[in-house]
Regions:
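Membrane-interface helix-boundary motifs at transmembrane edges
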Residues: 32-42, 90-97, 148-157
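Aromatic-anchored segments of alpha-helical transmembrane domains
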Residues: 49-58, 105-116, 165-173
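Membrane-interface helix caps and helix-loop-helix hairpins in membrane proteins
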Residues: 61-68, 92-94, 116-128
Length: 183
């Protein structure tokens, strides 16, 4: 039987420890391998990010019979995963494809991992998908920071802020229109 998820319970703390440990280990080891091996690891992380984000909604909807409205990849963490995955797979890397996941993903994925909205613990598939998906975002961003040596540029912060606001306006409007507000 699958136990209920307990926020900051033993299972949650262990999963966080493993997640962050794997991220640190991959980033550290990748700094001591050849450039050709770094390129292979970069591609593997990028393919894993994109593959997981593309397959996840289909798995939830068609295999686990979850409601499609809930599992469409229309949130900032999914956008972050797509962007950092594309960034890692591109030959000419677009700085904004690094910076948007840096600002959205690090804060969002860290907060999501620290305070997940889960009802069941391991070995529930949603538990695995949640920690794997958000952990990958952090891995992609920290790999770009520590191994590929990319850094966010302060002059691009305002562009990132405008893109964020433009993405949030329709989402907020749609959310407000979808729910009846009390008079």
């Amino acid at each position: 039987m699958i136990e209920p998820f307990i926020l900051f319970g033993e299972q949650h703390i262990e999963t966080l420890t493993y997640t962050f440990g794997i991220i640190v280990l991959i980033c550290l080891i990748s700094n001591f391998i050849s450039t050709s091996l770094q390129n292979i690891v970069t591609k593997i992380i990028g393919i894993s990010l994109l593959g997981f984000e593309i397959l996840r909604p289909f798995l939830y909807i068609f295999v686990f019979e979850k409601p499609w409205e809930t599992y469409l990849p229309l949130h900032m963490c999914a956008f972050s995963a797509f962007l950092i995955g594309i960034f890692l797979l591109s030959k000419s890397r677009n700085q904004m494809f690094f910076e948007l996941p840096y600002y959205w993903g690090v804060g969002g994925a860290t907060m999501a991992l620290a305070t997940p909205d889960l009802t069941l613990g391991w070995p529930d598939v949603e538990y695995f998908f949640f920690f794997y998906g958000h952990g990958q975002i952090l891995l992609g961003v920290f790999f770009a920071l520590t191994v590929l040596k990319y850094r966010p540029h302060l002059q691009n912060f305002w562009r990132m802020a405008v893109i964020t606001i433009l993405l949030l306006i329709p989402v907020s409007y749609t959310h407000l229109r979808a729910h009846e507000t009390p008079i």
